């Protein structure tokens, strides 16, 4: 029986399943093989995070910004869906595994690590569709997404601190 690597990498959900992204945002057909194959070949164990946006709003959601997700209800939702993941990671760490990295998605309002998505203006959707409202532009800005902030705090509370959060830049 081969020895275990005891190395764990935590992945944002869409790295393994692009189908949870907002429609129109997929830049690969299913799983992000360019990022995942090297991890698998190196023998890393993979823990997939749940997709907070999909579990909160479903598949037929609009793209949103960090300002729209930064609410007490969404943060509570993030903490609730993270609880079993944190329990698993704590159990793995207690069993001698090393949680090396969390791979997020830069530019995401939820899973951004170095950059998130900002730019909420508000208004009625009919005005935006009909062109009667000012154009609303989302921009990338430095900072963590809401889910990554909650994950980082939950990891710290569980005593899992010696790991890196890495933002995978899907914009190229």
Question: How should each PLM-predicted stretch be described?
Answer:
Residues 18-19, 56-58, 108-114, 118:
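Short catalytic/ligand-binding loop motif for oxyanion handling, primarily in non-cytosolic enzymes
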